[in-house]
Amino acid sequence: MKRLTLLPIFALLAAQSAWPQVASKANENYKTKDGRDGVAKTLDNPNRDKSQKPEEIIAAMDIQPGMTVADIGTGTGYMLPFLSRAVGARGKVFGEDIQNDFLDRARAKISDDKLSNAQIYLGTETDPRLPAGSVDIELVLDVYHHFDYPDKMLANLSRALKPGGHLVIVDFYKKDRADHIRLEREDVVKEIEGNGFRVTSQRDKVGNNQYMVTFAKR
């Protein structure tokens, strides 16, 4: 009888260890150095400002001087100069990514642009490894669909937020990039709400024909 009782437990543990990475297709180009170099060229395209409209996103985030803002999945650090200016000398900017070769480029950008209020954090697929209770606003720009383990990542993003802090998701509509985007906007909202957040505001169009949803912890 004891052996029979234990079988469901072993089955559950096996299922958990084999839990699928939900963003494997979106992350295909990130698995090799050559692939990441190709992505980096896109991220650092000198014409990107015209399509991404970073200043529009910054304005919609309602960043105040002195805040601490985290750029989750910063990549090569494209948004860091814009965020650095927005928070000012008394503020802080955390640039987080899970790829060290991307972060090498972000570090160079911080040095070249003299972003004295910017810091780099190397995270993992499940944890940005930011200090607990340290961040006023977390920006997830074109990155949520890359989260392989969204539940775990959201739990750790929540842990890093200050009381009253906000999580800002900016991403593409699935209908526009069906081969790359995992969820429709409404399903993204449901997934994040299911992990202890509530919606505080939404915009149908910002940046590069993207949506923006701002969340606070429940």
Features from the language model and the residues they span:
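Class I SAM-dependent transferase core
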Residues: 21-70
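Short glycine-dipeptide loop
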Residues: 65-66, 89-90, 161-167
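Class I SAM-dependent methyltransferase SAM/SAH-binding core
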Residues: 70-128
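A short glycine-rich, Lys/Arg-flanked "PGG" loop and its adjoining helix->strand segment in the class I
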Residues: 84, 151-166
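A short acidic, Gly/Pro-enriched loop at the edge of an enzyme's catalytic core
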Residues: 128-138
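A short SAM/SAH-binding and catalytic strip from SAM-dependent methyltransferases
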Residues: 136-150
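Conserved class I S-adenosyl-L-methionine
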Residues: 166-190
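Core SAM-dependent methyltransferase catalytic element
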Residues: 189, 201-218
